[in-house]
Structure formats: structure tokens, C-alpha cells
Amino acid sequence: MTSAELKHLLDEAEKSPRQIAAAVSGLPEKILRYQPAPGKWSILEILAHLVDIEILYAYRMRQMLADKNPTIAPIDQDDWARNLGYLESVPAELVALYGLNRHYNLRLLRRLTPEDLEKSAFHPERQARVTVADYVGMLSGHGSNHLAQIERLKKEAR
């Protein structure tokens, strides 16, 4: 990954918390809790997921940067949504936590060297190694993917 590619991905990642905050600002509970089908996430669950995955990515990237030959522990994001109280969350807190965690991750990522970006961990679900650079790419696109999902849910719920 070139320094220009890294800068572009991090600049995109920086926009996400503001975009998510704007998309959910002032939404009534009915829309925040609307589920398009059984087992499909509401906007509230998406917000909680964004926070948890930001924390998860933070941990995984730090493992790669600091530990010797780490292995990533897989998760089931639907189990997390069901078992971690996503529907009992406070939307404004989730928006704030997402922004703060993203900010903290970006502070770390902006000071990495090209060698740091190639540090890796074994991902058992993929049966392959993944790098910090791979996670930068995932982090950069994660919020925008869910922003599109939030916009669709807002239209469906009205």
C-alpha cells in the first residue's frame, strides 16, 4: 500500500462517524428500531455493531502490530447483536463511541510505517494471513457500507 493509498483510505474512514451521526440525527424510536425482517438488523443494532466492530478492529490491528504471530479469534456478529444488548443501547452514546473509537484508531494508523502495514495475523475463518493494511481497507469501507444500509432502512421504515 502506498502512502497516497493509505492517506486516501484514512481520509475516507475519518468521514464515516460524521456521516453516520448526520444520518441518524433526530430519528424517532420507531425508525431506529424498525427491522425489515426477522433476524435483520435495525438502525439501532447497526449503530451498536459499528461500535463493537471498531473496537474489534482496534484490538486485531494492535495484536498484529505488537504481538508475535497472533491468531485472530473469530466472532459471530449476529450472536453479538443478540447477546450484547444492542436493542437496549442509547443511540447518542453509540454515535459518540463510534466517533471516539474511530478517532483513536486513526491516530494510530496515521503514524504507521510501510513495514507496520505488512504485519499480520492468522485468520482461521479465511485460513490465511491478514495484514494491518487489509484491516485499514476494511475499516475504511465499513462505515460507508452501513451508511447505505441505514439510508435504505430509513426509507423502508417511513
Segments predicted by a language model, with ranges:
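Short, contiguous alpha-helical
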Residues: 33-77, 106, 118-158
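Alpha-helical bundle segments that constitute or directly flank the non-heme di-iron/ferroxidase center
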Residues: 2-29, 51-59, 63, 137-141
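A short small-residue
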Residues: 1, 78-86, 122-125
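Short acidic/polar alpha-helix capping motifs at helix-coil junctions
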Residues: 8-11, 23-26, 68-71, 83-87, ...
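Solvent-exposed interaction patches of small proteins and small membrane subunits
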Residues: 4-11, 35, 67, 88-89, ...
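Alpha-helix N-cap/loop-to-helix boundary motif
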Residues: 5, 12, 38, 42, ...
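A short secondary-structure junction motif
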Residues: 23, 27-30, 68, 112-115, ...
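Acidic/histidine-rich alpha-helical segments that form the ligand environment
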Residues: 12-18, 23, 81-118, 139
